[in-house]
Amino acid sequence: MKNLNKFVSIALCSSLLGGMAFAQQTELGRNPNVRLLESTQQSVTKVQFRMDNLKFTEVQTPKGMAQVPTYTEGVNLSEKGMPTLPILSRSLAVSDTREMKVEVVSSKFIEKKNVLIAPSKGMIMRNEDPKKIPYVYGKSYSQNKFFPGEIATLDDPFILRDVRGQVVNFAPLQYNPVTKTLRIYTEITVAVSETSEQGKNILNKKGTFAGFEDTYKRMFMNYEPGRYTPVEEKQNGRMIVIVAKKYEGDIKDFVDWKNQRGLRTEVKVAEDIASPVTANAIQQFVKQEYEKEGNDLTYVLLVGDHKDIPAKITPGIKSDQVYGQIVGNDHYNEVFIGRFSCESKEDLKTQIDRTIHYERNITTEDKWLGQALCIASAEGGPSADNGESDIQHENVIANLLTQYGYTKIIKCYDPGVTPKNIIDAFNGGISLVNYTGHGSETAWGTSHFGTTHVKQLTNSNQLPFIFDVACVNGDFLFSMPCFAEALMRAQKDGKPTGTVAIIASTINQSWASPMRGQDEMNEILCEKHPNNIKRTFGGVTMNGMFAMVEKYKKDGEKMLDTWTVFGDPSLLVRTLVPTKMQVTAPAQINLTDASVNVSCDYNGAIATISANGKMFGSAVVENGTATINLTGLTNESTLTLTVVGYNKETVIKTINTNGEPNPYQPVSNLTATTQGQKVTLKWDAPSTKTNATTNTARSVDGIRELVLLSVSDAPELLRSGQAEIVLEAHDVWNDGSGYQILLDADHDQYGQVIPSDTHTLWPNCSVPANLFAPFEYTVPENADPSCSPTNMIMDGTASVNIPAGTYDFAIAAPQANAKIWIAGQGPTKEDDYVFEAGKKYHFLMKKMGSGDGTELTISEGGGSDYTYTVYRDGTKIKEGLTETTYRDAGMSAQSHEYCVEVKYAAGVSPKVCVDYIPDGVADVTAQKPYTLTVVGKTITVTCQGEAMIYDMNGRRLAAGRNTVVYTAQGGYYAVMVVVDGKSYVEKLAVK
């Protein structure tokens, strides 16, 4: 087949080139002829089966050559020693309460004589080699009757959230081992109907949650969309993060982002559920949350290791998934479960960082998307799902991905795959991994790539998600971090590597049933089922496992219970390189507005209005518009619009409000310029330092005034008897080195650790761990003695407040693989230096001649009562700044929106934003989208947006659209202009 529009690269691991051959069967189809003939609500359903693609494979047995039959989606559930006779299953929606029955309406068959059907090897686990398991003929081969007997049966009913279902099984192959007669049913028509008896596992329904409609349509042949009235229409439902107490303070950024992108997310501390935390308590809590009014709990994320939040353990089972199995007594999840397994704050932070970056920061430049890795063992065959070997199985998946649009498929198939093959694939950039083979707690069997190799991964934020079919790769109860945990915690130079999410088993997996689950996961991912489109990792994987349970019954249930999601179950998956969305929104809204309309050129995108991690409304884009209903707005001065879409760049915009005047003055004159590979931001400080420790409002004759009360006119540092020490550096040597300030309050280290006659603090890299012990204070606060320290100031600013007094101090300058220097020129080491109360000592490191040195600036009233926060494209990149300059490294090649916000003790200012556009792209940065004139005492602002004029106390004096005119009384004023969601602030003086 030729495709002139797309080139697909198929790469083979080098170990497979040459010498490899295997028998290639005709690829099996995946669309058996099973169709719905009639459905009258849940009372009567008629279904017809027609045989499709029946094949026979010859195998050697103790009785000679025998036949193993296979057909499309047929599954061998025969016990060991019984004839191998695949069945096929389909799920139906049935009555909520009644017992159901199945009757054969009609059938057609043919018979083959003198056929020896091979005995089943039973359920084979993936820690076994199928070839080494012998064929054993059981007692059934001496019985003169047809097996399995009935050609149509019903399983016990199950409940999937709001629908009761039941599986009808077709057994079209019937075999008499004594007469060696194989009866092949080419067509079977059945009727499934309700009886007058009450059935098992009944459903007491309160209503349906519309977010699962697609799942029902895919799961149940006879499901009728909209036959139930949803209680509440919610696009994404709700997520609860259950977090161990020790990580409660570390989860905020994750929760804020989830709310910002439109998923209502709440936090529950595990120890507040029960102390000690038990699996039963977690299970009961999730059930209670699910049963709350609205019926919208969709995701639960567990944060902590097994010892923090235990898995549910029963004989042969270690399960997180059972926490999501709530309604009925079956193994179908109503809630998607995931886990950030962590043993330290660092473990947790990297999982949070990778998840947020994946959803928020991926751009059209991320060309690694659309590239996939398929890994397979050299085993499997007739007893596996669809009769496929692992290699055949992965080839089916590879073909599916190629048809969907993946541009590169790397195939690593045994024999001979090495860890380097896998490392190279990861480091080259891939977005999806499918693994089918053997496994251990710490490695993949094929390639032997394991936890010891993870440190060699350098795929920083180019993270695939993984569908993993293997034994115990996800056993997080193991004595050391398991394979899945290692991939989720992996870092290189502080940046996430490894994977963004992985589904892996806590126990030994069966050979065949997970293959069916993996097939379905990839089919859902590639949108093969229009009635079951899923965009989250939890949705894709769980729905894939539903197909496994439907076909493999009890074994499928066991596999589902133990197939664990490591990562965020609500993760919005990406498959191909994203494209941009065109989004427009009002520059300003009223706090009293009931809704806001957002235009977007991608239907299905989710648009959300939020502020500081609180969601005020969310809607899906339909016909180019999302109408967001707003609730909960109070006095927010700015709002954030976030729009996410499948395989789209995330769009984040600022929307201003016309609420009460903000007493917290913003920065002004924000600029963005290029210095090498850096974008340098500069701005002017707020006009008045708002010292607002008390912020009250009172009404006088109907005029609302804002009163700012200061505790004292004296600077805080002076009152507390402290001095502020600030260290600032910006890649002085351009080699990754930095600086540390060491402060000795006993002032007895000059001539000891601090040499009096040299600028070498330590002569080599064998640095004692306690070298800095005599120094009571350091900048940064956790400075460590090393030639390559973890904590130093390389590109940025840090400060510490110290009691005023006499100190010895030095500025350490570590050099990798050499020594620890003391910086050269200026006050870089001092004996008995007096730091005065109420003053700020700012050490700015610079290149001076052929060496380095510092400029020391001493100012009164150190410890400003506000700091600056910098945002890039809506994402916070730096906070706690005290300087009016910030350098963003490595960002000069692309356009960005930068915003600066002033954070005061009691509130924050409006953001002021500027567009940075690289040289040669467009010279528009100097063009302000407004004009500002002062004639006499008349201020005139003209723009295509909103304009506001404030006095220096923060009172708004005039506001309007397009043109605002105000007659001033003399003095200083601030003008804010908002155009296309971006804010511009200027100060001016009127004489």
From Swiss-Prot:
Species, as recorded: Porphyromonas gingivalis
Binding site for Ca(2+) 1: 305, 476, 485
Residues binding Ca(2+) 4, per UniProt: 520, 523, 529
Official protein name in the record: Gingipain R1
Superkingdom as given in the UniProt entry: Bacteria
Active site (UniProt): 438 (proton donor), 471 (nucleophile)
Notes on activation and inhibition: Requires cysteine for activation and Ca(2+) and/or Mg(2+) for stabilization. It is stimulated by glycine-containing dipeptides. It is resistant to inhibition by proteinase inhibitors in human plasma.
Subcellular location: Secreted
Catalytic reactions on record: Hydrolysis of proteins and small molecule substrates, with a preference for Arg in P1
Gene: rgpA
